C-alpha cells in the first residue's frame, strides 16, 4: 500500500504557503510570490486534492475566492459573491476549456476582454447615485472604500439613468501616473512601489481619501452583478455600461470559433506593448448570458469564463558585481552588473537597484543567482533572488562610505533613503550635468555623445554648459584631439549653435534643477514665459500652479539663490541661448489646426511624439489623449491602434503623415 503521509504533509505545506501568499497579496499589497509561482503552486494543490480528496483541508485556498479582510475599514457582505477566474496557461488548456463548453452548448459565441492587472471592486448605485464601493476582500465580505472610490475620476458619482444596480470593475494605475507617483515618493524619501498593481491596491486602502484623490487611479467596468439588469450578451452589456457613463475597456472582440479565438489572442499580444496600463492576460467569456447558468460554476470560479494568462518573460543570470554610481544631483545609485542575458528581446547586462534600502530589502548579493524581467516591459529589474542556490561565496552587500568619483564622505538626510555626494566640484557630477544638458529632451545636441563629453572635460575644454558655446574659440585645440577632423568639428559647432534656438522649456529642463522633469519644465515655461519671471517668483506664486508642489517650488528657490547658478544662467543668455517661451505663442497665421482638438496614434516616421506635439501646439492645436465627438482630427502613423477604428466609427477626419507633412510645409513651420 502506498505511504500517503508525505502526500498529506505536502498538501498541508502548500495550503500554509498559499494562504500566507493570499494574505500578503490581498491584505498587505506586498506579495512574496510572483503570479507564475502562485499559479504553479495552486495548480499543484488542485491536482493533489483531486487525486487525494480525503486529505483536502477545510481551510484550503482552493475553496476561497480571495484573501482575508483587515479591520481598518468596515466589512460588508457582497450581494453576489465576487468570484475569481480559473486560469489557463497554454493553447492545449484553452482548447480543453472550449471543448467542455461545446459538449453542453454546440452553438455559442465568445467575447474576449483584456485582463487588467489591478484591484477588483464592486460599485453599488441607488437611483443612479453611487452609494457604496466594496473591495473583493475574501469574495464574500469586502472592505467599504466608498469615500476613496468617490475620488476616482473615472468612477461616475451619478449615472446617466436613475437605476438601482451593482457593477464590477478593476481599479488600476496607468504607467505615467505610476512613474509620477514613484518620482514623488522618491523626492519625499519614501519607499517606492514595486509595480502599478501594488500602488493601486495600497492607494485604494488608504484611510485618507485626500491621498487617494492625488494619485489618479482609474477604472474599467466589465460587468453587472444584478441578473435582471444584464443584457442578452456580454457585448451588449459593455455597450450598456458605456452608455450609463462607465469607463469600459475598448479592446474586446467577438469570437465565433476556436480558430478565430487563436487569431484574436495574437492580436492582443501585438497591442499589449502599446498599452499605458498593465495587463496579464485575456478574459474569455461565453457571450450569451443565458448560457452562464447552464454551464454553472465551481465553489471558486465560473465555468463559463476563463483567463488566458500571458507568459511573463524572465531570464536567469548571476550577479557579477554591484557598483555605486553618482548622478548629476549627487545621489548615489547602486547598479547590478550581471552576466549578459536576453530578456524580452534585448541583451541585459546592468540592472539599476534604486537605493541601498532596496538591496537590503531584497537581500541582493554579489554572485547571487537571480531572475530578471522587465518592469512594465521596459526597465530591467531583479524579480527574485534564488536563495536556494546560495553558497558561502555570497556575502551581504555593504554600503560605500565615500563618493566613488571624488571620495567625499557621503551624507544621508535624516529620515531619507538616498545617500548623496555634496561636493559641488565632484568630477562625475559635472560630467553627468553636461551629458544631461546635451540630451535629446534637453538641448538635443546629439553629436555630443558621452565619450566626447568626457574627452572635452578631461582636456579642460568644458566644465559647465556655458563652456559648450565657447568651443568655437578653441578649434585649434579640438583639431589636435585624435579622431576629430575638420568635418566632425564643424558638425559639433553647428549643432551647438543651433541649440540656441531651443525653447525655454527645453533650456529649463537642461539646467538640471532638482525635481524639474520634462513635464514640469513645460508647465513652468508656459506659465512664466521667461527665465526672469521664474527667477523673481516666490514659492507661493509657483505653488499656485496646479501641477506644482512645495518641493518643486523650494528647489527652484534654492537653485536661484545660488550665485554660481545665477552666473551660469546670465552667461548662457549673453552667449545667445534663448530663455523665452515659444510653446505658448499664438500662431502668426490661422491654419486648419488653430484651436482644434487633435489626437495622435501610431508612430510617425519623421517626427517623435514630442516633436510633432510641439509643432502642432505651435500651430495653435490643442493636443488631447482620448477620442470623443469633440475631437476635430486624428493624426495616424504606423501601427495605429484602436483609436483609428473608433475615429472611423465617429466619422472624425483622419490625417496621415504625408498629408500632415504637406500642411506643416504650407504653413512654413520649422520641424
From Swiss-Prot:
Domain spans labelled BRCT: 588-671
E.C. designation(s): 6.5.1.2
Binding site for NAD(+): 35-39, 84-85, 113, 136, 170, 285, 309
Described function: DNA ligase that catalyzes the formation of phosphodiester linkages between 5'-phosphoryl and 3'-hydroxyl groups in double-stranded DNA using NAD as a coenzyme and as the energy source for the reaction. It is essential for DNA replication and repair of damaged DNA.
Cofactor or coenzyme needed: Mg(2+); Mn(2+)
Transmembrane feature ranges: none
Family: Belongs to the NAD-dependent DNA ligase family. LigA subfamily.
CDD domains in UniProt: BRCT_DNA_ligase_like (cd17748), LIGANc (cd00114)
An annotated Gene Ontology molecular function: DNA ligase (NAD+) activity
Pfam families in the cross-refs: BRCT (PF00533), DNA_ligase_aden (PF01653), DNA_ligase_OB (PF03120), DNA_ligase_ZBD (PF03119), HHH_2 (PF12826)
Lineage, uppermost ranks: Bacteria, Bacillati, Mycoplasmatota, Mollicutes, Acholeplasmatales
GO BP annotation list: DNA repair; DNA replication
Keywords associated with the record: DNA damage, DNA repair, DNA replication, Ligase, Magnesium, Manganese, Metal-binding, NAD, Zinc
SMART domains from the UniProt entry: BRCT, HhH1, LIGANc
Keyword Magnesium recorded: yes
Catalytic reaction equation(s): NAD(+) + (deoxyribonucleotide)n-3'-hydroxyl + 5'-phospho-(deoxyribonucleotide)m = (deoxyribonucleotide)n+m + AMP + beta-nicotinamide D-nucleotide
Catalytic EC class: ligase
Binding site for Zn(2+): 403, 406, 421, 426
HAMAP family: DNA_ligase_A (MF_01588)
Origin species: Aster yellows witches'-broom phytoplasma (strain AYWB)
Active site annotation, chain numbering: 115 (n6-amp-lysine intermediate)
Protein's name in the database: DNA ligase
GO cellular component: cytosol
Amino acid at each position: 500500500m502506498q505511504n500517503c503521509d508525505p502526500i498529506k504533509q505536502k498538501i498541508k505545506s502548500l495550503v500554509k504557503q498559499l494562504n500566507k501568499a493570499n494574505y500578503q497579496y490581498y491584505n498587505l499589497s506586498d506579495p512574496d510570490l510572483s503570479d507564475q509561482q502562485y499559479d504553479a503552486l495552486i495548480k499543484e494543490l488542485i491536482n493533489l486534492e483531486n487525486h487525494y480528496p480525503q486529505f483536502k483541508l477545510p481551510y484550503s485556498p482552493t475553496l476561497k475566492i480571495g484573501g482575508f479582510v483587515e479591520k481598518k475599514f468596515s466589512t460588508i457582505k457582497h450581494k453576489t459573491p465576487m468570484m475569481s477566474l480559473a486560469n489557463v496557461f497554454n493553447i492545449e488548456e484553452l482548447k480543453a476549456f472550449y471543448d467542455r463548453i461545446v459538449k453542453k452548448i454546440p452553438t455559442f459565441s465568445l467575447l474576449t476582454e483584456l485582463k487588467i492587472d489591478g484591484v477588483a471592486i464592486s460599485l453599488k448605485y441607488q437611483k443612479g447615485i453611487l452609494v457604496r464601493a466594496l473591495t473583493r476582500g475574501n469574495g464574500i465580505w469586502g472592505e467599504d472604500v466608498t469615500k476613496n472610490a468617490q475620488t476616482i475620476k473615472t468612477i461616475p458619482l451619478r449615472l446617466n439613468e436613475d437605476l438601482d444596480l451593482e457593477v464590477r470593475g478593476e481599479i488600476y494605475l496607468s504607467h505615467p501616473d505610476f512613474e509620477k507617483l514613484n518620482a514623488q515618493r522618491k523626492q519625499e524619501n519614501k519607499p517606492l512601489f514595486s509595480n502599478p498593481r501594488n500602488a493601486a491596491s495600497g492607494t485604494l486602502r488608504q484611510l485618507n481619501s485626500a491621498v487617494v484623490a492625488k494619485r489618479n487611479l482609474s477604472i474599467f467596468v466589465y460587468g453587472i452583478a444584478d441578473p435582471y439588469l444584464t443584457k442578452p450578451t456580454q457585448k451588449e452589456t459593455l455597450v450598456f455600461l458605456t452608455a450609463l457613463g462607465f469607463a469600459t475597456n475598448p479592446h474586446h472582440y467577438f469570437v465565433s470559433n476556436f480558430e478565430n479565438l487563436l487569431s484574436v489572442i495574437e492580436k492582443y499580444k501585438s497591442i499589449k506593448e502599446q498599452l499605458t496600463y498593465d495587463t496579464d492576460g485575456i478574459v474569455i467569456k461565453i457571450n450569451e448570458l443565458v448560457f452562464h447558468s447552464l454551464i454553472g460554476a465551481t465553489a471558486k470560479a465560473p465555468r463559463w469564463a476563463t483567463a488566458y494568462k500571458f507568459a511573463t518573460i524572465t531570464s536567469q543570470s548571476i550577479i557579477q558585481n554591484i557598483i555605486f554610481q553618482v548622478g548629476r544631483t549627487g545621489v548615489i545609485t547602486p547598479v547590478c552588473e550581471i552576466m549578459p542575458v536576453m530578456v524580452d528581446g534585448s541583451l541585459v547586462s546592468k540592472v539599476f537597484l534604486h537605493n541601498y534600502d532596496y538591496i537590503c530589502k531584497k537581500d541582493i548579493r554579489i554572485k547571487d543567482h537571480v531572475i530578471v524581467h522587465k518592469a512594465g516591459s521596459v526597465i530591467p529589474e531583479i524579480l527574485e533572488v534564488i536563495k536556494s542556490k546560495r553558497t558561502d561565496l555570497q556575502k551581504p552587500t555593504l554600503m560605500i562610505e565615500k563618493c566613488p568619483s571624488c571620495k567625499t564622505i557621503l551624507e544621508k538626510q535624516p529620515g531619507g533613503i538616498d545617500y548623496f555626494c555634496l561636493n559641488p566640484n565632484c568630477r562625475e557630477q559635472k560630467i553627468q550635468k553636461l551629458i544631461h544638458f546635451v540630451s535629446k529632451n534637453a538641448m538635443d545636441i546629439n553629436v555630443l555623445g558621452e565619450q566626447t563629453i568626457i574627452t572635452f572635460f578631461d582636456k579642460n575644454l568644458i566644465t559647465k554648459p556655458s563652456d559648450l558655446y565657447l568651443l568655437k574659440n578653441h578649434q585649434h585645440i579640438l583639431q589636435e584631439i585624435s579622431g576629430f577632423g575638420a568635418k566632425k568639428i564643424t558638425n559639433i559647432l553647428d549643432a551647438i549653435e543651433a541649440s540656441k534656438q531651443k525653447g525655454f522649456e527645453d533650456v529649463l529642463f537642461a539646467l538640471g534643477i532638482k525635481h524639474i522633469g520634462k513635464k514640469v519644465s513645460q508647465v513652468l515655461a508656459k506659465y512664466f514665459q521667461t527665465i526672469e519671471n521664474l527667477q523673481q517668483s516666490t514659492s507661493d506664486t509657483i505653488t499656485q500652479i496646479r501641477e506644482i508642489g512645495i518641493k518643486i517650488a523650494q528647489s527652484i528657490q534654492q537653485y536661484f539663490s545660488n550665485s554660481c547658478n545665477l552666473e551660469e544662467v546670465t552667461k548662457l543668455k549673453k552667449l545667445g541661448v534663448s530663455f523665452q517661451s515659444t510653446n505658448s505663442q499664438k500662431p502668426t497665421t490661422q491654419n486648419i489646426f488653430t484651436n482644434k482638438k487633435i489626437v495622435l496614434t501610431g508612430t510617425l516616421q519623421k517626427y517623435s511624439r514630442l516633436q510633432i506635439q510641439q509643432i502642432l501646439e505651435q500651430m495653435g492645436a490643442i493636443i488631447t489623449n482620448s477620442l470623443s465627438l469633440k475631437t476635430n482630427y486624428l493624426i495616424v502613423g504606423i501601427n495605429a491602434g484602436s483609436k483609428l477604428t473608433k475615429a472611423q466609427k465617429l466619422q472624425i477626419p483622419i490625417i496621415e503623415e504625408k498629408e500632415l507633412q504637406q500642411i506643416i510645409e504650407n504653413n512654413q513651420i520649422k520641424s
